[in-house]
């Protein structure tokens, strides 16, 4: 099944809800970055959370999320847009612990760390950026997105993200949900939401069992009849890197640096952090870039 995200209204229009299956997308990220179990779970959770923030944006806006904890994984970066295109990378892809956490799951908190920052940069188009930042309060990532939304954007939310990793480090299931309270929600509605959230199985297990974004939202809302589906968006790992973009980046280094690449290295190779695609530049190509540089 191809990955996709569903947006809906629930609780008599008092909550905006999102759910996504991201299994194939996170499989692609794992394959490109050769991530081990804990790094895979952390990257997959971050990418899925970023996907939800991207889905909140307007047509031409983009979101970049950076989670910088004090754990061995190091910084995790993901970006997404309103079209469901997502990419991401983790600084240390090879983190695996033989011991599980107290809940019997991969110890993502230990990998990410419990001290650090979650930063969100919104590219609003027209060269305008908005930056928000909150401390990491959990290291489990879903709770950190929840805290960011409540603190930085003043939106009471609940974010659940999960990745099920096989013993051979391949991805079995991935996805998540996000619920946001809208102004006017009554205490009764809040109580009902809390009851449904408590009864919800873990995200990765639901997806492993074949649940769809629609069926996850039905569980979240307390029934299919309580959902008003707004939009369904395909989700995929997409990177917009290109040789031309890297060429422009090399030009920005200046003539001295490019001359050094030509005379000392006799060429250059650039690798994209997000997708690991590599671009080779010959001496002749570097000479052309040298001519364009200042």
Swiss-Prot record:
Entry keyword set: Chaperone, Cytoplasm, Disulfide bond, Redox-active center, Zinc
A GO molecular-function descriptor: protein folding chaperone
GO biological process, one term: protein refolding
Entry-linked Gene3D superfamilies: Hsp33 domain, HSP33 redox switch-like
Localisation: Cytoplasm
Recorded family membership: Belongs to the HSP33 family.
Functional summary from the UniProt entry: Redox regulated molecular chaperone. Protects both thermally unfolding and oxidatively damaged proteins from irreversible aggregation. Plays an important role in the bacterial defense system toward oxidative stress.
Name of this protein: 33 kDa chaperonin
Gene: hslO
């Amino acid at each position: 099944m191809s990955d996709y995200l569903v947006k809906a209204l629930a609780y008599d229009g008092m909550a905006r809800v999102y759910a996504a299956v991201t299994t194939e997308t996170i499989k692609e990220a794992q394959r490109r970055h050769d991530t081990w179990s804990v790094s895979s779970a952390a990257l997959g959770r971050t990418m899925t959370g970023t996907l939800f923030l991207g889905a909140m944006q307007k047509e031409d806006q983009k979101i970049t999320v950076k989670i910088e904890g004090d754990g061995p994984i190091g910084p995790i970066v993901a970006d997404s847009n309103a079209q469901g295109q997502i990419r991401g990378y983790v600084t240390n892809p090879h983190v695996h612990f033989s011991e599980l956490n107290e809940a019997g799951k991969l110890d993502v908190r230990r990998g990410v760390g419990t001290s650090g920052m979650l930063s969100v940069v919104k590219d609003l188009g027209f060269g305008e950026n908005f930056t928000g930042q909150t401390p990491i309060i959990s290291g489990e990532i879903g709770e950190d997105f929840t805290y960011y939304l409540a603190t930085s954007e003043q939106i009471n939310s609940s974010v659940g993200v999960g990745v099920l990793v096989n013993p051979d480090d391949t991805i079995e299931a991935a996805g998540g949900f996000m619920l946001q309270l809208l102004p006017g929600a009554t205490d009764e509605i809040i109580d009902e939401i809390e009851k449904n959230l408590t009864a919800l199985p873990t995200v990765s297990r639901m997806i492993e069992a074949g649940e769809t974004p629609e069926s996850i939202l039905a569980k979240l809302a307390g029934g299919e009849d309580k959902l008003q589906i707004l939009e369904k968006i395909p989700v995929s790992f997409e990177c917009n890197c290109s040789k031309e973009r890297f060429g422009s980046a090399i030009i920005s280094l200046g003539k001295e640096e490019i001359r050094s690449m030509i005379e000392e290295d006799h060429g250059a190779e650039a690798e994209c952090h997000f997708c690991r695609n590599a671009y080779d530049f010959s001496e002749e190509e570097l000479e052309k870039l040298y001519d364009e540089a200042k």
